[in-house]
């Protein structure tokens, strides 16, 4: 008994000692820091570390009721926090214990089924420790239900879902474990402890815990790189396989991590980011039910597209959406605008897209899943006040409302989201421009109410950043100097057709500094009492508002709030005060910045434009200081723009024109009559906020060529200005530029280029001259129609007119008949013997042309009349002599190119230019049918070749002088073709035509043949004044079966059908007939000239037809090689075929040479001029026009000159045996099934005339 009691007392004392030790350890925990001191833990997104007091109170207090029951329970020094939490999945209540890291165990989170299990676990642990100390048997321990090692966790986050409001989401390596707290304080407590323990555990594992980096930047950067990743806002999402998730193979389970500047996608079981997306690269985000989506831009590593993610429920998706928007707004508030370099075009383009998207917001397309997208920034964006910084505006879908004031650092900035591109002008309320008007140095006039209900409209339809001069306010210069970087203050931008704010004018009547010649001016509301700017008016032609006769563009103000004395603007923009309205800045849309910022003293320095970075990477420097003097005599002040600064933009901007779709002609006429009835000096009442008037829903602005000084080099760029028609001139029912159907007729602009000058070295300051104004531009700059073509073009510098006319003549005939004064409906193209037109004014190397044609070289091909000539474009006159008429292109160039079809012609090299200078041309001159055309003359032509010219006196005559200057002894030289064709035609030319060709067989070319570079041939119909401009490849089609070349205008229903055969399949094309005759030619001994034409036929045989299966016999190669003559290139053959189609008289020469003029029409070279006279006498040839004749030599003697005909017949060789003829079927009306207008050129017709155009069925 005594021994038993002694043993029991000893165990009791041992237990008491253990309890005392546990109490001491607990006291030590209370009085000492729980965690080792180190670098403060900064949570990403918070910027602050966890307070140490929270640790102290959390470790000792904040216990639940279950903990208070067992306060005397020794839990050990490693327990940091314990309490009841619920599991998210099923809502089961579990007892969670957070333990610190010890020497034998890492930091961990454990949970038990209840507190009683935890107590038993603690007692079992104590008993095990005692047993281990005494050497007794160790009782079994009670393990927890789960242990989560914290250093292996990815992150922890707070959130809420549809069921629970206070969630603690713990992300392990491979799963997502969420706990539910009872209240917000409990949630915050657990989150702070977990986040700090996770981060310190990771640091300890990485060896960075307690490391104090030096102050050196390299050490700080190294420490930051070694810092383990930790994210505050994390969601586990399932990326759906749609959009980018499908294209980039991003579908699956990801951790979506949001920081202050970026979004990171991390896969399971790793901490390395898979995709990193900058927040500024996100175009929009939204949610629908349990789906959250992001639309990213092209600056991301995965490219543009959408990412659709599935989350727990709709509440989580909504919270994600709100948090993303909050981060985006924070970036905007912190002036983080790196995206300006990535895809924002300019401030003006931002405003354009924002305003234009207003009309289309009601038609938001559905997403692939069927949900509507929520626009970024909750479908609104911040518009900061530009000059005064009074308040901020939130530009919503339908209205503009003021918001909270903004900091001074945000003043002068405009941040707009990227929206859809649209070129339609829309209107905004007056409050928008009232807040945009900079007026820091000007007090508000007492008579001006803060809200006068005035509506301002702004037409902004350009796509670039125009630059304007500074206003007269003292702070304008400071605003420009202080706004560096990627931003452009609103008082410096202009876009295309107008400027939205004209604020900052003083009270001394100075000129407007914000008018752009492309459109209307809308000035701010708070002008001075004597300011010359209309506060809310608008020019009816899209021009300057005016209050005191200040309209720089001549347009009368039409808005409310004008002074009674205002109204019609002075012609040059001169204000009644002392401010110029015609100086300064530049407009991106293609006009002069008229009235752009001359101060009261006319200081030109204020007109300097501040250049900013834009989407196109660069903008040209202002050239208004480099303006050349105007040519004598100087024109009067123009009504459409100032004389300072070139209206040229950078980056190859396009010139857009609005299309009048909505308003009818009756509405226009009624509007014109109504505007004409209003007196000029009367003030008009406020109108509703439309772009132009309340009757028209379409903001159409008639355009005309702007006033510009001659450019340094000839250019395709045309400064444009609105067609300003005053009220007294608007009584006519229709614009002079509209045709009978109500369409605005646009024609290529013509501005006089400077005189010929030698090429200059490239100037680095004028790099845009070579890019924006190069002749290889893809765009043809247009001007409105009929009246713009002068009857007597003036060119004070003696140079030729613009090169853009060749692009105009490539248009279909219905688009070119009206402005030239041709009232007939004939599609026939008469021609006149042409002249060479030099290329000295072009940027290309001029080719060698005959000096005797210099006298006949025209000085210009037509140009628009300058406004200085009377202020209105002149009209053509049918009674003027032909020398005063607008000339037409007179050269058709046939060139062969290489293997590939190039979509855009490159600039020719020096070798290519030298090769082109000696290439073969067909010169045509187009003139009126009534003109008296002299017969073609053969004087001065080479004696080595005869000229066959037979001018027949009929409506379709005046044929052709054709000269083949073929240097037989020198195969290196090309042929020189000169085709002078019949008069009176609508010119029909093609910019470019390409079709594939098989390679030319060696047996057909001979040893001295000119080798072609590839399998393609390029036929270019082009003016001598204009380099080649490629059409779309799909616009030219060749049908090998029918032998037709279809030239289809992609913008109309017109089509030109150049037929090489009379029918589809019944008769072989001319090339096939040539191949049939070639069999006969091979059996005959070939003379020098005949071998030449045999080689020509062999070259033509490369043309793609159905007869290409025939292989040329090698027997013709030795004959060709022995002749030592170059083969007739396909360009010459096509030129010859074109000539024969228009000149049936040359068929006599072909018949005299022994060829069938109906099946194969070729030229017969003659020895000298006498032989040419002999051949001219042969008009009717049995082998050609008379198929039944069997004696061509006898028929040759029936001409006018019997002796010459006999001589030619005696010298002519025997004709070859006639091949099998295929009967010509009758022409069918419904041969073409398309409903297009065809101009059919049949090279196989016997009557050698064109078919009249007919409408296909």
From Swiss-Prot:
Q: Where is the composition biased (Basic residues)?
A: 408-424
Q: Motif (YXXM motif 5) spans which residues?
A: 779-782
Q: In which tissues is it expressed?
A: Expressed in myoblasts. Expressed in liver and hepatocellular carcinoma.
The terms under GO molecular function for this entry are: insulin receptor binding; phosphatidylinositol 3-kinase binding
Gene Ontology process terms (BP): insulin receptor signaling pathway; signal transduction
Give the residue ranges of motif YXXM motif 1.
487-490
Q: What is its main location?
A: membrane
- List the cysteine pairs that form cystine: none
Q: How is it modified after translation?
A: Phosphorylated on tyrosine residues in response to both insulin and IGF1 signaling. Phosphorylated on Tyr-921 in response to FGF2 signaling. Phosphorylation of Tyr-921 is required for GRB2, phospholipase C-gamma and phosphatidylinositol 3-kinase interaction.
How is the protein disposed in the membrane?
Peripheral membrane protein
Ranges of compositional bias, category Low complexity: 510-524, 800-810
Q: Which domain of life is it from?
A: Eukaryota
What this chain does, per the entry, is described as:
Acts as an interface between multiple growth factor receptors possessing tyrosine kinase activity, such as insulin receptor, IGF1R and FGFR1, and a complex network of intracellular signaling molecules containing SH2 domains. Involved in the IGF1R mitogenic signaling pathway. Promotes the AKT1 signaling pathway and BAD phosphorylation during insulin stimulation without activation of RPS6KB1 or the inhibition of apoptosis. Interaction with GRB2 enhances insulin-stimulated mitogen-activated protein kinase activity. May be involved in nonreceptor tyrosine kinase signaling in myoblasts.
Q: Which disease is it linked to?
A: Hypothyroidism, congenital, non-goitrous, 9: A form of central hypothyroidism, a disorder characterized by sub-optimal thyroid hormone secretion, due to insufficient stimulation by thyrotropin of an otherwise normal thyroid gland. It may be caused by congenital or acquired disorders of the pituitary gland or hypothalamus. CHNG9 is a congenital, X-linked recessive form. Patients have a small thyroid gland with low free T4 levels and inappropriately normal levels of thyrotropin.
From the Swiss-Prot or TrEMBL record, give the protein name: Insulin receptor substrate 4
- Provenance organism: Homo sapiens
